[in-house]
UniProtKB/Swiss-Prot annotation:
This is UDP-sugar transporter sqv-7. Keywords: Golgi apparatus, Membrane, Sugar transport, Transmembrane, Transmembrane helix, Transport. One of its GO terms (biological process) is gonad morphogenesis. It comes from the Eukaryota. It comes from Caenorhabditis elegans.
């Protein structure tokens, strides 16, 4: 894949690893909260994550820790359609986490990679290399096999993941486009994504009755200190995940952000088979998962190896004499 400006290798690797680690953490935190502790509303959890992001960035700007443009009439034009994509990505991701076992959740999420690759080509004019296409093909092929033989199939859960994949792909590509424009910066994108969608999200939570269910649960004996800790950790992780996603997209491509971390996929996939208790083993399904994981590893190797090689060679000025055009050590 090609890019006009590339960040240093350490920035690209660190941001990708950071995003991968936080992605692992929040998947397990949300899964424990929604499935193990049976918190009744993933929509309410999403609102909590949005409010945490708004409050953290508001006070960080107040104390001059971060900077981003103040709200004015030009902000909606500069940021759209990111808030809508962010909201649907958040809600569908939480819903899928609640309804699908972790191994299948991570495998099905890889379909967003193909969608991202297509959107990058049409919106950002970024063309994937042959090696990248092969690795993506392995990920998608393995995911397809695993999905066919998933014994715990949930139609609504699969629909949630499909919506999540579309939103993830579009969110990554448009985030890259907005970051390149440098109008709002990393923190501005995060703050206004949440601010513009907070009221609509609250309306949805109220309309669906999730607000009453969450409120009743939080006043009951089921809301133990462990559940409170998990809920607050989920809200904070939502902010950190947003930051790590924007940071990774800034230093890498949108496709790399979507594909990030075979370690994340390995860890979540295999540990999730035992930790969540809702995975049903089947050999064909297990084989498909492993093929998809191998594709993830291959993609990461190809991406960072090719980018590292590309950044090492710089064209010499055309005006230099021929005798100085010698290879550099």
């Amino acid at each position: 894949m090609t890019s006009t400006v590339q960040s240093p290798l350490y920035s690209r690797v660190f941001s990708a690893v950071f995003y991968g680690v936080i992605s692992v953490l929040i998947v397990f935190v949300n899964k424990i909260l929604l499935t193990n502790y049976k918190f009744p509303s993933f929509l309410f959890v999403g609102v909590g994550q949005m409010m945490a992001t708004i409050l953290i960035l508001f006070f960080a700007k107040m104390f001059r820790i971060v900077q981003f443009p103040s709200l004015d009439s030009s902000i909606p034009r500069k940021i759209m359609p990111l808030p809508l994509l962010y909201f649907f990505n958040l809600i569908s991701g939480l819903g899928g986490t609640q309804m699908i076992n972790l191994p299948m959740f991570t495998v099905l999420r890889r379909f967003s990679i193909l969608m991202t690759m297509i959107l990058e080509f049409y919106i950002l004019n970024v063309k994937a290399s042959k090696a990248v296409k092969i690795s993506v093909g392995l990920m998608i092929g393995g995911s397809f096999i695993a999905a066919i033989y998933d014994l715990s199939f949930d139609a609504l859960g699969y629909t949630m993941i499909f919506i999540n994949n579309i939103c993830t792909a579009a969110l990554g590509v448009y985030t890259k486009q907005k970051l390149d424009a440098k109008d709002l910066g990393k923190y501005g994108l995060m703050f206004y994504n949440c601010l513009f969608m907070l009221l609509p999200a609250l309306c949805v939570v109220q309309y669906t009755g999730d607000l009453d269910r969450a409120y009743s649960f939080m006043l009951s004996d089921s809301m133990t200190s462990s559940v409170w800790t998990c809920f607050l950790l989920s809200c904070i992780c939502g902010f950190v995940l947003n930051y790590s996603l924007v940071l990774c997209t800034h230093h890498n491509s949108a496709l790399t952000t979507t594909c990030v971390g075979p370690i994340k996929n390995l860890f979540v996939t295999y540990v999730g088979m035992f930790s969540s208790g809702d995975y049903v083993f089947q050999w064909a399904n297990f084989t498909g998962i492993n093929v998809s994981v191998f594709g993830s590893i291959l993609y990461t190797y190809v991406t960072f190896r090719s980018k590292s090689t590309t950044i090492s060679y710089k064209p010499l000025p055309m005006t230099m004499p021929i005798d100085v055009h010698k290879p550099r050590n």
